[in-house]
């Protein structure tokens, strides 16, 4: 447990950031899974879910949660599925 005041503050800040990052990643993964499930089932709203998944991937990459190359690779794979 940190003793220095600034280190104590950092622990609190990191905890908040970890929760925020985990929530963002979960949202991204859920959007991708929803699209894949809809595409496999041949649902009508697959194109809307595709756009939502791409948006979540871009948001995660821009915030540094995933590497930009991973986002691009995942988007490419989703686009291939969408065709």
Swiss-Prot record:
Keywords: Ribonucleoprotein, Ribosomal protein, RNA-binding, rRNA-binding. GO terms for biological process: translation. NCBIfam families: S20 (TIGR00029). One of its GO terms (cellular component) is small ribosomal subunit. The lineage of its organism: Bacteria, Bacillati, Bacillota, Bacilli, Lactobacillales. Coiled coil: none annotated. This is Small ribosomal subunit protein bS20. The gene is rpsT. One of its GO terms (molecular function) is small ribosomal subunit rRNA binding. InterPro entries: Ribosomal_bS20 (IPR002583), Ribosomal_bS20_sf (IPR036510). It comes from the Bacteria. HAMAP family: Ribosomal_bS20. Belongs to the bacterial ribosomal protein bS20 family. Disulfide bonds: none annotated. Pfam families: Ribosomal_S20p. The keyword Ribosomal protein applies. Binds directly to 16S ribosomal RNA.
């Amino acid at each position: 447990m940190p003793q220095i005041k600034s280190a104590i503050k950092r622990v609190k800040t990191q905890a908040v950031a970890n929760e925020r990052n985990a929530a963002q990643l979960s949202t991204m993964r859920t959007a991708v899974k929803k699209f894949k499930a809809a595409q496999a089932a041949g649902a009508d709203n697959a194109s809307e879910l595709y756009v939502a998944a791409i948006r979540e991937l871009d948001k995660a990459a821009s915030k540094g949660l995933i590497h930009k190359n991973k986002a691009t690779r995942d988007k490419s794979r989703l686009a291939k599925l969408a065709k």
